[in-house]
Design a protein with these regions (language model features):
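Phosphate-binding beta-alpha-beta segment of Rossmann-like dinucleotide-binding domains, i.e.
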Residues: 87, 95-149, 164
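Glycine-rich Rossmann-fold phosphate-binding loop(s) that bind the pyrophosphate
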Residues: 155-156
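N-terminal glycine-/charge-rich "phosphate-binding" loop or analogous flexible N-terminal tail
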Residues: 1-47, 172-174
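N-terminal Rossmann-fold NAD(P) dinucleotide-binding loop
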Residues: 159-160
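Rossmann-fold NAD(P)-binding glycine/threonine-rich loop
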Residues: 77-87, 236-239
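Short beta->alpha connector loops at strand-helix junctions that form conserved
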Residues: 31, 72-73, 89-100, 236
Length: 239
């Protein structure tokens, strides 16, 4: 069985082993694959793995031996799933690997906005603090999150993780998700409409997959509805 990985470097830059897959068949790993290289490299393969290399309908139809596509990420948006279904090809993803990492990234971005850590670190290294007239040094106001409102759009695994971190930091948490009904045990929590979330939140964290229903939901009107001081963190995925 021929197995092809189209963009292995994004998943394994050298710290993991491909040995388990090598036991299943004739494995070829490409670090990166441009669009014009997909068909030549995948021709004859029964199994193709991709992380971010797109597999469009035309490409899938050009690979008659293909029986399985493994998306090495959560979003299916890089694969034309309808074309794969028509061709009888199974498509799978990895739905839960990034829950904690994405939650952490949301707050890494947010804390940088609140404290400008990189800027102040660079300025301290330049000597501005030691040369300054005061013990305290800052170029921007430092924003405290405790007591502020975190608005989570999309309250699945990642959204709930973001909410849990916000709760631990003393924030009030509100969420909008038309498909979620089970409230968490945070100190302060409420499901609200999207309009109310935009109006109330000091931080809006987008943690949903892209669908036809929510495409373009953060438009000019949505931005105008937010507080002038609010932060918008986009941690969504393509599909």
């Amino acid at each position: 069985m021929k197995i092809v990985i189209l963009d292995g470097y994004t998943l394994n830059p050298g710290d993991l082993s491909w040995a388990p897959l090598e036991k299943l068949g004739d494995l070829t790993v490409h670090d990166r694959t441009d669009a014009h290289e997909i068909i030549p490299r995948a021709t004859g393969a029964e199994v193709v793995f991709t992380n971010k290399t797109p597999l469009a309908a035309e490409t899938i139809r050009s690979l008659p031996e293909l029986r399985y596509i493994g998306v090495l990420a959560t979003g299916y948006n890089v694969v034309d799933v309808d074309a794969a279904r028509t061709a009888g090809i199974t498509v799978t993803n990895v739905p839960t690997y990034g829950t904690h990492a994405v939650g952490q990234m949301v707050f890494a971005l947010l804390l940088e906005l609140c404290h400008h850590v990189q800027h102040h670190s660079s300025e301290v290294k330049r000597g501005r603090w030691s040369q300054g007239p005061d013990f305290c040094f800052w170029d921007f106001p430092l924003v405290e999150l405790a007591g502020k409102t975190m608005g989570v759009v999309g309250f699945g695994r990642i959204g709930r993780r973001v909410g849990a971190i916000a709760d631990a930091m003393g924030m009030r948490v509100i969420a909008h998700d038309p498909y979620a009904a089970d409230p968490p045990g945070y100190a302060e929590f409420a499901f609200v409409s999207m309009d109310d979330l935009l109006k109330q939140a000091d931080v809006v964290s987008l943690n949903c997959l892209l669908t036809d229903e929510n495409r373009g939901m953060i438009d000019a009107d949505a931005l105008r509805a937010m507080k002038p001081t609010a932060y918008l963190i986009n941690a969504s995925r393509g599909g």
